[in-house]
Amino acid sequence: MDSGDFSPMQSNFSLGFMSFEDIPEDARTTEMIDKIVFEEDKEYDHTQDSFRYGRVTTGVSYNLVTGKIPKTVFEQVKAKDDENDNVEFEMEHLEDKETAHKTQTFDELYESQMPKYFDYQSNFSDVNGIWTLLFDQNHYEKMSTFELQAAICAALNSKHFMMICVGIDAFNAVTGVEMSAKDRVVFRMALTRAVAGEFQPPLVKVAPKQLTGVSPMKRDISEVTSSIDVLFVPVIGVTDEVENNRFLIVVRVKEISDKVYQISSGRIYNEQEGRVVEMSDMNEAFHKLIVEKSISDIQTRRGSMFMLEPEPFLEDSAVIFTESNEIPSENHEISRVHVKNCTERSLSQSLLNLLDIQNIGWIFFGTALSFCIYNNAIKPLVK
């Protein structure tokens, strides 16, 4: 998918508030169900798992519904993965206290404003402090991992918390997306793939088989990084005879990073006026993301970024300013004479200040010494 296709329905920095309500019994078990990757081959054929392979270092984009990639690309990335299976698993940033504090800040913003479930066609209010991208349910079938990568890259480079919400129409009504348990598993694996293999510097350092092997926990992005995850928030009240299987998809970026990120294709993204914008090159990225972001106080833009020069001021001025801006014409000549005299006095006073008593003594001593040398040495020779 081309970068020009990335056009979320809505994008905003939120301002609103939504209160919690009691969680229905079905909703309480949703998270546990989503963690399950089917172990029986009849329900889920692991041999057809496109996410088992494909450490996406060649710009591959998965479809979020089918989880498929082109066969030719599949063989290439599979061969590359077999070479990289000995990569050690690293999650140092999970132990970083500063990262944990930032994640906690996001969790506080999210939990205080987002409900545990939504009523069908209810209004989606803004969320304060979190950049929010909204997509409708029709866009879900066309979405690819590229759109997730571009938005995540923009959020990280712009130092924003972010939510990508899929299942909200043009009127901000929550419709959700119809998803089976298998669909949710495929989406989780797609997000894990998008985050684990596409970013430079890497967001997750992990070998492909460790990431997408038999263990179901390794298929959830929240198990390998604390900065990004996905939630499936239940949407209830749909008048269908079938069981309730509508969810609002919420992809969350919970960490603010000081690094500059790009995806494997070399593209760099940034947030501008609530939109995901591709930057032209790395030079532009460093200029906008480092120089401009480091100058947080707008006042510093008025002068040197290294030193702020003081404002002009008057000290011991000979001219007395009055509240009136008009000076009578008969006083003009007097003012000029007064200013001239004050200027001459100031110059002479400045010279005297430079010459203290000690300096005057040395001047007299030098003059006397020069006179003696002239009389005793130079004058007899001239005669």
From Swiss-Prot:
GO CC annotation, single: mitochondrion
Consequence of gene disruption: Triggers mild activation of the piRNA sensor, this activation is lost in later generations. In a slfl-4 mutant background, almost complete loss of mature piRNAs and piRNA precursor accumulation.
Top-rank taxon: Eukaryota
A single GO BP: primary piRNA processing
Compartments in which it is found: Mitochondrion membrane
Principal subcellular localisation of the protein: mitochondrion
Parts of the chain that traverse the membrane: 354-374
Keywords: Membrane, Mitochondrion, Transmembrane, Transmembrane helix
UniProt membrane topology term: Single-pass membrane protein
Region (SLFN-like fold): 118-266
Family: Belongs to the Schlafen family.
The protein's role, per its UniProt record: Component of the trimeric PUCH (precursor of 21U RNA 5'-end cleavage holoenzyme) complex, that acts as an endoribonuclease processing the 5'-end of precursor Piwi-interacting RNAs (piRNAs). The PUCH complex consists of tofu-1, tofu-2 and either slfl-3 or slfl-4, where tofu-2 exhibits endoribonuclease activity. PUCH-mediated processing strictly requires a 7-methyl-G cap (m7 G-cap) and an uracil at position three (U3). PUCH also exhibits a strict bias for piRNA precursors with an A or G at position 1.
Entry domain remark: The transmembrane domain is mediating the localization to mitochondria. The proximity to mitochondria plays an important role in piRNA production.
Subunit structure: Component of the PUCH (precursor of 21U RNA 5'-end cleavage holoenzyme) complex; consisting of tofu-1, tofu-2 and either slfl-3 or slfl-4. Within the complex, interacts (via N-terminus) with tofu-2 (via N-terminus); the presence of tofu-1 is required for the interaction.
Name of the protein in question: Schlafen-like protein 3
Native source organism of the sequence: Caenorhabditis elegans
